[in-house]
Amino acid sequence: ITSQLGVLMRYCIRTVTWRFKESIELDPEFVNKRSVVIRSPSDVFENYQSLFKDQVRERFVVLWLNSANKVIGFEIITEGLLNSSLTHPREVFRGAIVSTSASIILAHNHPSGNPEPSQEDISITKQIVESGKIIGIPVHDHIIFADNNFTSLAERGLV
């Protein structure tokens, strides 16, 4: 079992490292964003809007935070269809666990330009929040990006 656990940990570390490098390549300003302290939904919007700019498909991203709410990394979990981005809690928390995140923030875009959360958005958020409670990694917010606007599900009492 010990050797199997070692293999699994090496796989997870390689996967997170690959995703992390992929994220940096997508956003060359990431080095500056890694030290961002998140105090409000607008901090997320201002610092990570470039991940969603000009996207024609939904993109679902998870920000990993330390105990001081400083971003220690992020991962693009899925890129979906024109109006949906399917994701599962295990994908959301895999990188957060390996990176020893204290908490996470979810973010995705609506290419339609409408920042209102859909029923699917609310449902998956609730599912991920409950999963986070079970494993001890709280979800602070779910931000929906749309053009030059955003909606915080936490501000609406949905997180």
Describe each PLM feature range.
Residues 1-26, 46, 66-68, 78, ...:
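Active-site-proximal loop/helix of nucleotide/amide-processing enzymes and allied scaffolds
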Residues 16-76:
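Long amphipathic N-terminal alpha/beta scaffold segment
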